[in-house]
From Swiss-Prot:
Entry's Gene Ontology cellular component terms: cytoplasm
Pfam entry (one): eRF1_1
E.C. number: 3.1.-.-
Assigned keywords, A-Z: Cytoplasm, Endonuclease, Hydrolase, Metal-binding, Nuclease
GO MF annotation list: endonuclease activity; metal ion binding
NCBIfam families, per the entry: pelota (TIGR00111)
Broad enzyme group: hydrolase
Localisation per UniProt entry: Cytoplasm
BP GO terms, sorted: nonfunctional rRNA decay; nuclear-transcribed mRNA catabolic process, no-go decay; nuclear-transcribed mRNA catabolic process, non-stop decay; ribosome disassembly; RNA surveillance
Highest taxon above the source species: Archaea
Domain characteristics, as noted in the entry: The N-terminal domain has the RNA-binding Sm fold. It harbors the endoribonuclease activity.
Subunit composition and interactions: Monomer.
Protein name: Protein pelota homolog
């Protein structure tokens, strides 16, 4: 995401959309009665015919729809302004926002926490492709803020099938991996697996992709369980420290360890966490993003809490439904805080 302009007087932010993560964030921050200015198309009657006409409109937002990994955000609302010759003011309309588009978002008042989220998103540039490989299977995935997208999950030909099968299988993986690298243009590749096969794959990848950074790591299997394992590793933090999905999993693991050994350093529940924030005791808070889409009063309360945490140098991690820790956190009321010190 690029922030092209912020007009404080109009409370208008102009953005250029660069990734699915950007669309996901806009889905979270767009609220009913916000206004958006964007290019769109609409069927317009021209005599006896109708044609789909491109135009720029102002839309008063009703609600948004986002389906992860579709590269599109649908913004539903009422047309507040459009070229008069088309006579469509007041009509219902849906703007399809895609990667590469620009949009202006106008709010009555931009919340500092939400603006800071936009700025953090604009500073995110790193992306990594993860390939887990073993002699008989492999998995290729890419992390987004809203979850992990599995790009490929396949079995390989058995080792006893023919001579040179290890090299052939390594080339098969490397060739497919190279295609995904061209598509997603990651900053780095993480190759992980239980044996030496990952080194064979790395050689083939290096032969195809000359200037792409490759990290090697060990993992127990080339499966989804192995993927969950590698997401908790320090190597992931090293490569993509700004991806909350990896950080969130590690923080949740820390919270569970503290609950077992030092439960006084963890609290959960809206009122309990709010109390801890007021005392300046919160080091990290994890919150499911559903709570930011709940009724207006609760959402405003949570937004103020999160802003207060960051003002006191605490860390906020928003957990989407696609996160591996989502249901675990939801079962703990949806909001949990790791504390700097014990409180009553």
């Amino acid at each position: 995401m690029r922030i092209l302009e912020f007009d404080e007087k109009r409370q208008a932010v102009k953005l250029h959309i660069e990734s699915e993560d950007d669309l996901w964030l806009l889905h979270l921050i767009l609220e009913k009665d916000d206004k958006v200015v964007a290019k769109t198309t609409r069927d317009v009657g021209l005599g006896k015919e109708s044609r789909r006409i491109p135009m720029t409109i102002i839309l008063k937002v009703d609600y948004t729809e986002f389906q992860e990994f579709t590269n599109r955000l649908r913004i539903h609302g009422i047309i507040e302004d459009a070229p008069e010759r088309f006579g469509i003011k007041g009509a219902h309309h849906t703007i399809n926002l895609d990667i590469g588009d620009e949009i202006i978002i106008i709010k009555q008042q931009w919340n500092k926490y939400v603006l800071d989220r936009l700025k953090r998103q604009a500073n995110k540039r790193s992306r990594i492709i993860i390939a887990l490989v073993d002699f008989d299977e492999y998995l290729i995935a890419i992390p987004f803020e809203q979850g992990i997208k599995i790009l490929s999950e396949k079995s390989l030909r058995p080792l006893n099938e023919e001579e040179g099968i290890i090299e052939q299988n390594a080339l098969e993986i490397a060739t497919e991996l190279a295609e995904y690298v061209k598509q997603y243009d990651p900053d780095a590749i993480l190759l992980a697996g239980p044996g030496f096969f990952k080194e064979e794959v790395s050689k083939k990848v290096n032969a195809i992709l000359k200037n792409k950074k490759i990290y090697i790591d060990s993992v127990s299997s080339a499966t989804r369980a192995g993927l969950h394992e590698v997401l908790k590793r320090d190597i992931i933090d090293k490569i993509m420290t700004d991806y909350e999905i990896a950080i969130g999993a590690k923080k949740m693991e820390k919270a569970m360890e503290l609950l077992a050994k030092q439960p006084e350093l963890v609290t959960y529940g809206l009122e309990q966490v709010k109390n801890a924030i007021e005392m300046g005791a919160v080091e990290t808070v994890l919150v499911i993003e559903d709570l930011l889409s709940s009724d207006e009063q609760e959402r405003l309360t949570i937004e103020r809490m999160l802003e207060d945490i960051e003002n006191k140098r605490g860390e906020v991690i928003l957990v989407p439904k696609e996160s591996p820790i989502y249901f675990e956190l939801k079962n703990l009321t949806g909001i949990l805080a790791i504390l700097r010190f014990r409180i009553n």
